Amino acid sequence: MSGLYTETREVLRKYGVRLRRSLGQNYLIDEVKRQRILEYADLREDDRVLEIGPGIGTLTLPMAELAGHVTAIESDPLIAAILMDRLQVDNVDVIVGDALRVDFPEFNKVVSNLPYQISSPITFRLLEHDFELAVLMYQKEFARRMVAEPGTREYSRLSVMVHFLAEVEIVDYLKPGCFFPRPRVESAVVTLKPTGFRAPAFLEDVCRALFQHRKKKTSKSLRESFHEIRTDLSFNEVLRGLPPEILEKRVFQLRPEDILEIAEHIEDLSGSS
């Protein structure tokens, strides 16, 4: 067994902790993978790092030695108390709370083994902020949807939104045995670099409407889910002026730029009505 596995078990035993999968408490125990994650993050003395779901400090402790400051947000008060007890440095702040609700401090990098049940909302919340780089662990299937291309089975609303908001790359995969306790799924390490793209007001609504019927033609999908688009325009008003080559495609065949064109079309009409 690895030293990190032994260390993790000893810490949990010392504090009498029983981990809960429902909270995404699967801790990294593979030393090689941990080192790779730190290398991808390329931490330096002037970096201010945000970590979500630090657990007992598997990443927090080595990051504190490399970065200028680390802020760790932990939702479980017991685990947060253990982390604070283990910290022997003064450049780490631990916030006890829900990462979807608490105010984020200033940061330029994010490094996290994310609780997988909040993967989507926390990713979009992070992308509302300006930062240099994120190195994040996700469930493998979620990561593949993030980078999926049009026409593939994994292509989704997530794929389209992330396409515009960040440069995304899957840089590593992790088997269940890399964690304790073992999750039921494989995982992936993903790097994100925000593009600074400002999405038009209707892009998210259009994506949501279209991908409710991803195998149908775009015109039919829009008709059936038009109520998802928060506009005073009618379906027929929107339909007019959209290129036939877009309307005839099935939703899963649409390029992100096609969907952006629909959203911008609605925005233009809304501004002129």
From Swiss-Prot:
It holds the Pfam family RrnaAD. It is an enzyme of class 2 (transferase). Keywords: Cytoplasm, Methyltransferase, RNA-binding, rRNA processing, S-adenosyl-L-methionine, Transferase. Its EC number is 2.1.1.-. S-adenosyl-L-methionine binds at residues 26, 28, 53, 74, 98, 113. Gene3D superfamilies: Ribosomal RNA adenine dimethylase-like, domain 2 (1.10.8.100), Vaccinia Virus protein VP39 (3.40.50.150). Belongs to the class I-like SAM-binding methyltransferase superfamily. rRNA adenine N(6)-methyltransferase family. RsmA subfamily. It comes from Methanothermobacter thermautotrophicus (strain ATCC 29096 / DSM 1053 / JCM 10044 / NBRC 100330 / Delta H) (Methanobacterium thermoautotrophicum). This is Probable ribosomal RNA small subunit methyltransferase A.
